[in-house]
Structure formats: C-alpha cells, structure tokens
Amino acid sequence: MLRQTVLQLAVQGRLARQEPWDEPAVKLVERIRKEKGQLVKDGKIGKTKLTPEIESEEIPYPIPKNWIWTRLDHITYISTGSTPSTSTKEYYIGGSIPWVTSSLTSQKLIFNADTKITEKAVEDCSLKIYPEGTLLVALYGQGKTRGQVSELGIPATINQACSAIVFWKANAPVKEYLKLVLTGNYEKIRSISAGGAQPNLNGDKIKRTLIPLPPLAEQHRIVARVDALMKLCDALEARLKERAAVQGRLVGSVVKEVVS
C-alpha cells in the first residue's frame, strides 16, 4: 500500500518539485515523434497506425501545466513476438538467440532465457530481436503475470504473450520514468483485460495506455525521489519482519513456560 501511494503521488506531480525553467513536456513529445517518423521512413522500425488522440473525458486527474497527457505508442514503438513451431527441430536445436516468454517478466531485469532459438526461426517466423533496454509488458500468463513490467538486459526475441516497448535516442531518457508509471499502474492495466477464465491484455490496450508525462528534468527528479522512498520502504519492511520474528520467538518462549 505504501509503495503504491508513493507511485501514485509521483505520477500526479506531487512528489518532486516543479521548476518554471524546465522545458515543457510538449517539446519533448514533439522531438520524440519527429525522430520516430524518421526511423519509420528509414525502415528502422515498422510503420504502425497511431492510436487516437486523447479525448478530454479520458483524462483521469489533473496534472501540472508543463506536463502533457500522451498515449504510450505516441512516444515509443510497441510490438510483440510469436512462438516458432515446436515441431520444427531446426528452430530450436543449436539455437543461441534468447526467446523470452511472459513467465520471465517477474524479473526486473532479464539476463537469460530458458529457451534459445536459431536464426532460421527468427527469419521464418519474422521475429524481431529487441535490443537491451527494451521494456516488456506481460499480456497474459499464470497468477500475477499479466501486467508485469520487466526490462531486457540482453538482446532477445519474445513470444506473443509480451508487448515490447522500444526506445531510441530521443525517448531513451524517459524509459525509467515510463517503467515507474507502468509499474504503478499494474492493477489498472490488469483491470482492462478481456476474456473469461484467463483474461488477456493485447497490444492495442498497451498502446492506448495514458501517460502523464512531465518535463524531462522533472522526470529525473521523480525517479530519484521514488528510488529513495522505495529504499525506505525496504528498510521499514525489514524492520517489521524482524519485529514479527522477535515477537514470534517471545510468544513461543511464553507458551513453553506455560506448558512445561
């Protein structure tokens, strides 16, 4: 609860100071979208249809005047992967390319994959090898998996149960803040899933995710502040566990005295 409160305050502009000389977030978005357009033109990322602009009734709460509401796919490139046929041995035997599934998104940083695939699998299945630093959002999976956010610590391919959020020069500095926003919206992201016994997210829902974007300088202040507060949460939780353990031993000693 305490961690969630910290994250909510952070994305509402109530955790770090606002400075009038910070470049407005709208300028940052303009640069990101311009560079994204050039990357599409150069064939470095795929051309995708942008989700609609944000309607006023979608905005959940007010933000500071030099912030901007944007959709996730307006400031990143979002794609997914697939599963090479397991009946085709050439896709797996001797493979060296990591293939990441949603089960690994419980890790904050992914440095290894349980399964490796071959270059033939990548080519035949039109898989993308996403660069180190790509964020992953689990679209579906067992238990708490759906909605989890992780980061690739290695270049890797992914399966269809993950959305990959890709960064480039202009938007790379916003990655840590976006990770914070997505992590803080874990329950909300899970709530927009569709389906019956095992609800699923999909790429379009991830693309449409609303992001309250501060100026870049303020993003850095927010991330630093959240990191410091999360360390305090870690220390508090450790103390509470220690106190509970001591109390448990004390109760055990009293019971032993009573029954002996």
Give, region by region, the residue ranges found by the protein language model:
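Extended, domain-scale alpha-helical bundle/helix-rich regions
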Residues: 1-58
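Non-catalytic DNA-recognition/assembly elements of restriction-modification systems
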Residues: 4-5, 14-15, 55-82, 208, ...
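A generic secondary-structure signal for well-formed alpha-helical elements
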Residues: 6-10, 14, 36, 40, ...
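Sequence-specific dsDNA recognition surfaces
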Residues: 53-58, 73-88, 103-132
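Catalytic cores of nucleotide-enabled group-transfer and carboxylate-activating enzymes in metabolic
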Residues: 63-74, 151, 165-180, 188, ...
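A short beta-sheet element
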Residues: 101-102, 112-114, 118-183, 195, ...
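Specificity-determining recognition surfaces
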Residues: 181-211
